[in-house]
From Swiss-Prot:
Mode of membrane association: Multi-pass membrane protein
Subcellular location: Vacuole membrane
Entry-linked PANTHER family: SOLUTE CARRIER FAMILY 40 MEMBER
Induction behaviour: By iron deficiency in roots.
Function: Vacuolar transporter that is involved in the transport of excess nickel into the vacuole under iron deficiency, increasing cellular tolerance to nickel under iron deficiency stress response.
Phenotypic effect of disruption: No visible phenotype under normal growth conditions, but plants have increased sensitivity to nickel when grown in an iron-deficient environment.
Organism: Arabidopsis thaliana (Mouse-ear cress)
Entry-linked InterPro entries: Ferroportin-1, MFS_trans_sf
UniProt biased composition (Acidic residues): 17-27
Family affiliation: Belongs to the ferroportin (FP) (TC 2.A.100) family. SLC40A subfamily.
Protein name: Solute carrier family 40 member 2
GO cellular component terms, A-Z: plant-type vacuole membrane
Superkingdom in the source lineage: Eukaryota
Pfam family, one: FPN1
Length: 512
């Protein structure tokens, strides 16, 4: 089994040169459709990344000197994704692409409009918490729920585009096409992560928080129509996507037919054995309950995921979400509390995303030479090394210097982080069957959200920004665990970690 896995992982790289020679004979992807896909994805990710950055600033403003509201939002968002992520993946599998697009885009943008409106209402009356706490609490809950629904619907779009459409569009082409599309998609996400915080930070610093919330709601209102038009154009313009949609519909109808046959075969014997049924009625009820639980969407999705060959890389990637060492809500709120200007935080987040963009350029070059599997291990431990700077900042007495060390360590680590992310995603695309892609993608995102939820729960427990150093150490320990798991996966497949005989200093030792 391990030898087969190694063969499958390295197959695309072993044949890379031969397929490059045949690339000219392959049908090329319609350029206009690829551009439409990228542009639609950019618009969708811009809104999601803007909200991701802004919500932490809104919450720390509404409840100063505490990470409580910020962490509470994170708990609601991550909790919803954890509970419903696998179900979202199965829903996508059971729906046509057009229905998924409508559900994703309408739900995401409508939720963001409501969240932006609720924030504006909170900011219009600065003393609302003391004047009318029930109204304040209601608006905060509305912000949390609508924001969480928006992020959950974004999950559907991420699974659809990153895990399905990109793979379908690249079928019949050389592996380099899939690698390039993965890199561009990740680059678009990181570009949004780079630019949206900078622009939002400038609006907040030089205009107002209220203006940023109004701008965000207006963006969601306008772009939903453009996004739908772009994605529908891609659907209609790429035959491979239409054919994949037809295969999905066929699988769905066959699955329903099998369930019907199974139900019939279960009940027919019962009609002929009524007396036996009465004697074992209570036991049958228990068995039926257990069967329903085992056959539920949630359990079957997780069972599917755990049976995949890439489960260890997936868990390693998910563990990286159990961290505050990113420009997420908790770290952003802490930096704001420490007195770092909002536009500086936005620029720092932008630099971090810029470093991540470099990963999308470096990854295709690296994986073509040493495979996605080995690229993953090298990129992971380079990220880990950069995070040592964040750990070192704990013992720096000057708060401003410590804050800038924290930001620098996080920003530098993004190169390794996003290369590792790309390496794991490509392994999933290579090794997960087409029929399981959306389900596995949904569970993967759910697992990531579960770990993110745990990080936010820690933020509630350790809500004083002065104690952020505790969260830093816990996060670093979790990242280390993720690296160990991925290294174990590498060793299981390759039976070794390094080619020690290729190291000059050890060459004589092996020769002797």
């Amino acid at each position: 089994m391990e030898e087969e896995t190694e063969t499958r992982v390295f197959l695309s790289n072993e044949q890379h040169q031969e397929e490059e020679e045949e690339e000219e004979e392959e049908p090329s992807l319609p350029r206009s459709m690829v551009i439409s896909l990228y542009l639609g994805y950019f618009l969708a990710r811009w809104g999601a990344r803007t909200w991701e950055f802004s919500v932490a600033l809104y919450m720390i403003y509404l409840w100063p000197n505490s990470l409580f509201l910020t962490a509470m939002y994170g708990v609601v968002e991550s909790g919803s994704a954890t509970l419903f992520g696998p179900i979202v993946g199965q829903m996508i599998d059971g729906m046509s692409y057009v229905k998924v697009l409508r559900l994703w885009l309408v739900t995401q943008n409508l939720s963001f409009i409501v969240a932006g409106g609720a924030v504006v209402a909170l900011l219009v009356v600065p003393d609302l918490k003391s004047q009318n706490f029930p109204v304040f609490a209601t608006l905060v809950v509305l912000t949390n729920l609508s924001g969480a629904i928006g992020v959950l619907s974004t999950l559907a779009g991420t699974v659809l585009i990153e895990r399905d459409w990109v793979v379908v569009m690249s079928e019949g082409h050389s592996p380099a096409v899939l690698t390039r599309m993965n890199s561009v998609i990740r680059g678009i996400d990181l570009s949004s992560k780079l630019l949206s915080p900078v622009i939002t930070g400038l609006i907040i610093s030089f205009v107002s928080l209220r203006a940023s919330a109004i701008t965000f709601a207006a963006w969601a209102t306008i772009t939903v129509w453009i996004e739908y038009w772009l994605f529908i154009s891609v659907y209609n313009g790429v035959p491979a996507i239409v054919q994949s949609d037809e295969r999905r519909s066929l699988r769905s109808s066959q699955s329903q037919a099998e369930e019907t046959d199974s139900a019939s075969s279960f009940y027919v014997p019962l009609l002929h054995e009524e007396e036996s049924y009465r004697n074992t009625q209570s036991r049958s009820r228990i068995l039926r309950i257990l069967e329903r639980i085992s056959e539920s969407s949630f359990v079957s999705a997780w069972r599917n995921y755990l049976n995949q060959e890439i489960v260890l890389p997936g868990v390693s990637l998910a563990l990286l979400f159990f961290t505050v060492l990113s420009f997420g809500t908790l770290m952003t709120a802490t930096l704001e509390w420490k007195g770092i200007p909002t536009y500086i935080i936005g620029i720092g987040r932008g630099i971090s995303a810029g470093v991540g963009l470099a990963a999308t350029v470096l990854y295709p070059l690296m994986q073509s030479r040493i495979s996605p599997l080995r690229t993953g291990v090298w990129s992971f431990w380079s990220q880990w090394t950069c995070l040592l700077v964040c750990v070192g900042s704990i013992w720096v007495e000057k708060e401003k210097i410590a804050s800038y060390m924290l930001m620098a360590g996080v920003a530098a680590s993004r190169l390794g982080l996003w290369m590792f992310d790309l390496a794991v995603i490509q392994q999933m695309q290579d090794l997960v069957p087409e029929s399981d892609r959306c389900v596995v993608g949904g569970v993967q995102n759910s697992l990531q959200s579960a770990l993110d939820l745990m990080a936010n729960l820690l933020g509630i427990i350790v809500s004083n920004p002065k104690d952020f150093w505790m969260l830093t150490l816990i996060s670093f320990a979790t990242v280390s665990l993720a690296g160990i798991l991925y290294t174990i996966h590498l060793y299981r497949i390759r039976k070794h970690l390094f080619h020690l005989e290729k190291i000059p200093l050890l060459n004589n030792f092996f020769a002797s």
